[in-house]
Amino acid sequence: MVERDRGVLVVTLLASMLAFGQVATGQDWPQWRGPSRDGAVTAFDVPASWPAGLTEQWKVEVGSGYASPILIGDRIYQFARQGEDEVMLALDAGSGETLWRTAYNASFDMWAATRMHGPGPKSTPAYADGRLFTLGISGIVTAFDAETGLQIWQRPAGPVEP
């Protein structure tokens, strides 16, 4: 699958599921694999009958990368790459409208081991206390205000000790 299409596919699928009837009624999905990091949805109302298929409600180009979207209330947050920038997006879950977009330059040198997977980002944002946290492809940790998209701070992640 083309890397560009992966981000569009993920957001399109999430939008289709939301339009069908709230995948997790009243349950936010604030980080990778959900609230408990186990991939389990606990607040799901099983429909009396399943539709024959999903109907696309909206579609938006978010960029490339491997970050999963997160859902907080009626907002979808997506971390992606657009050109030489890493971008944090807030989308309206009902319409797909971009509520805000914050970008910063994140040029990336492709090594042989990373060339197949592209320049990222590869980590899903995390949400806590009104803030979004991202880890960019070049090891930069950034905090954003979830309401406005304002970049609060940005720092190198530091060395990883095995």
Role assignments for model-derived ranges:
Residues 10-21:
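Bacterial N-terminal signal peptides
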Residues 22-162:
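Noncatalytic, solvent-exposed loop/strand surfaces
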Residues 1-12:
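Bacterial N-terminal signal peptides that target proteins for export
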